[in-house]
């Protein structure tokens, strides 16, 4: 998930079986939705050539956006299990788009990327997949998880990545919820769910206009409204929204982020959001005069290839195990193609040490399972549980600074 490029086109290639689909946009639009399974709405942008940094684009009709059941007025119980901003907490990014139960998809993985130990039972559709991964996250000492969210079928963003005939971004959520419910019934420790808002879906929206702000918001609404509030990750009573970068945003300012919380409070019992923004959100974009943008937290993506970022303005200790996308990416660093060796775990361990020493209260592991960029720390055939164990060792050390996290209900 590199700035402006990412491996979205690769993910689509890996995910899609070769079958006849209902719609096809012109070929050569990398990173866009250019295949639409039967029964899904065709994105308004399917036949446009979208480019990062392109001109501002109105998101158009939001008729495709449908909230889940956990939203007012029909749902009224918004009691949360909340952490405190004084706690030391750890999280990771969960790329739940995989379905390796299909032999063709698995074949495109094998020999190129790390593979989970039981790929025949590794799918976004399977509750047991999420339950196993969530339990391993708990074993790593993590407090909450950040599933990457790419919106609903039909949204105008550049990436919809349908895993035909299923749509992973929405259809994976019920399986995650069932996994949490199973653990709850079994008396397992809770793992809360926050939202990793993949802003590459924003399709050059202007987030200072009424239409742009509402598009920005409905993705948050439709993610959280699909998950029972007791499972939401919250800090100081505010559900977490973790923003990726601004490459696919044409304009924004402080009002863009304020709108998220204002609208969320209207729909979810007065709750406001705990917004952690990527470093590109520090100042407005496309707005004259420029202005500062603030929120609850700040991180910088890129620890996996570049190492620990010591910039003093950051509130999140971002760590990563290394990075490798040169199996398919050519052109060197200037094209965001990197091969950063894991050094047998030493690259990751050094960053974990720096994270503990930094004094920052939030640690984010980049990533749990973005296999196609070689940033995975989950259990795999290639690395076993090495990175889970390393994470646990240093998360325990981090939390030892203040004791266990405080959870209020």
Q: Each predicted region: which residue ranges?
A:
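Bacterial N-terminal signal peptides that target proteins for export
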Residues: 1-8
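Sec-dependent signal peptide cleavage junction
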Residues: 19-26
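Glycan-processing catalytic domains of CAZymes
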Residues: 28-409
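Bacterial N-terminal signal peptides
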Residues: 8-17
């Amino acid at each position: 998930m590199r700035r402006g490029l990412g491996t979205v086109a690769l993910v689509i290639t890996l995910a899609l079986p070769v079958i006849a689909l209902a719609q096809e946009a012109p070929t050569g639009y990398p990173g866009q939705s250019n295949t639409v399974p039967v029964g899904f709405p065709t994105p308004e942008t399917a036949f446009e050539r979208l480019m990062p940094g392109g001109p501002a684009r109105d998101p158009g009709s939001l008729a495709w956006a449908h909230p889940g059941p956990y939203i007012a007025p029909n749902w009224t119980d918004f009691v949360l299990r909340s952490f405190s901003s004084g706690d030391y907490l750890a999280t990771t990014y969960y790329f739940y788009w995989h379905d390796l139960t299909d032999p063709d998809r698995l074949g495109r993985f094998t020999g190129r990327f790390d593979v989970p130990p039981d790929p025949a039972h590794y799918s976004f559709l399977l509750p047991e997949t999420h339950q196993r991964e969530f339990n391993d996250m708990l074993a790593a000492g993590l407090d909450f998880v950040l599933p990457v969210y790419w919106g609903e079928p039909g949204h105008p963003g550049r990436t919809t990545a349908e895993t035909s005939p299923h749509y992973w971004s929405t259809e994976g959520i019920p399986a995650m919820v069932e996994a949490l419910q199973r653990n709850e019934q079994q008396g397992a420790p809770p793992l809360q769910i926050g939202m990793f808002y993949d802003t590459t879906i924003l399709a050059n929206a202007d987030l200072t206009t009424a239409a742009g702000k509402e598009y920005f918001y409905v993705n948050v609404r439709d993610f959280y409204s699909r998950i029972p509030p007791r499972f939401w990750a919250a800090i100081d009573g505010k559900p977490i929204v973790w923003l990726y970068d601004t490459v696919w945003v044409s304009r924004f300012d402080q009002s863009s982020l304020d709108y998220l919380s204002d609208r969320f409070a209207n729909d979810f019992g007065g709750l406001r959001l705990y917004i952690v923004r990527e470093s590109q959100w520090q100042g407005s974009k496309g707005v004259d005069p420029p202005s500062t943008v603030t929120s609850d937290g700040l991180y910088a993506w890129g620890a996996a290839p570049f190492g620990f970022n010591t910039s003093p303005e950051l509130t999140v200790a971002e760590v990563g195990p290394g990075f490798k996308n040169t199996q398919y990416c050519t052109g060197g660093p200037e094209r965001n193609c990197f091969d950063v060796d894991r050094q047998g775990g030493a690259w990751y361990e050094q960053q974990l040490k720096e994270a503990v020493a930094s004094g920052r209260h939030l640690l984010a592991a980049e990533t749990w399972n973005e296999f196609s960029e070689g940033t995975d720390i989950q259990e795999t055939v290639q690395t076993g549980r090495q990175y889970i164990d390393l994470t646990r060792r240093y998360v325990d050390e981090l939390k030892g600074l203040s004791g266990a996290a405080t959870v209020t209900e």
